Amino acid sequence: MSLPIPPRPADNSTSHSLCLTICGYRRPGMSEFDYRQHMTQVSAPMTADLMVKYGVKRWTMIHNTTESRALMDQLIDPQMANIADFDCFSQMVLHDLADYKRLKEDPWYREHLVGDHEKFADTRRSMMTIGWVTEIVRDGQVV
């Protein structure tokens, strides 16, 4: 049984987009360097045109390395004391969930990308979530 897509936020804005966030872990035994290299130099080039074909508005990767996580020591306070241990956040901004569903049904995706994910990702531990994007600041300006 498929759940209905929740409505857009109640402010009646048509500018809201969905953001699919994959909270990723690298494959066990893979170095941080090799994980990032595979995602940015192998997987991304194979995926980017397909994302454009199916209407993805933006796709970003945030790699959380040992070095970048060490910066958290400067930010920890009583309210923000729990540090996420994910290796990467991959975010896709979509106008419509159906676009992403069509992308995953594309024969090229199934043939090339499903297997590629197993080469770098711990797909059993990785998680995902989706939510509405509300932009507050863009390019240093309040929107």
Curated annotation (Swiss-Prot):
Entry GO MF terms:
lyase activity; oxidoreductase activity
Q: Which InterPro entries match?
A: Dimeric_a/b-barrel, EthD_dom
Task: Specify the pathway.
Answer: Secondary metabolite biosynthesis
Provide the E.C. number(s) assigned to this enzyme: 4.1.1.-
Which keywords does the record carry?
Lyase
Q: What class of enzyme is it?
A: lyase
One Pfam match, given by its short name, reads: EthD
| Purpose of the protein | Decarboxylase; part of the gene cluster that mediates the biosynthesis of the tetrahydroxanthone dimer secalonic acid D. The pathway begins with the synthesis of atrochrysone thioester by the polyketide synthase AacuL. The atrochrysone carboxyl ACP thioesterase AacuM then breaks the thioester bond and releases the atrochrysone carboxylic acid from AacuL. Atrochrysone carboxylic acid is decarboxylated by the decarboxylase AacuI, and oxidized by the anthrone oxygenase AacuG to yield emodin. Emodin is then reduced to emodin hydroquinone by a yet unidentified oxidoreductase.
Q: What is this protein called?
A: Decarboxylase AacuI
Classification from the root reads: Eukaryota, Fungi, Dikarya, Ascomycota, Pezizomycotina
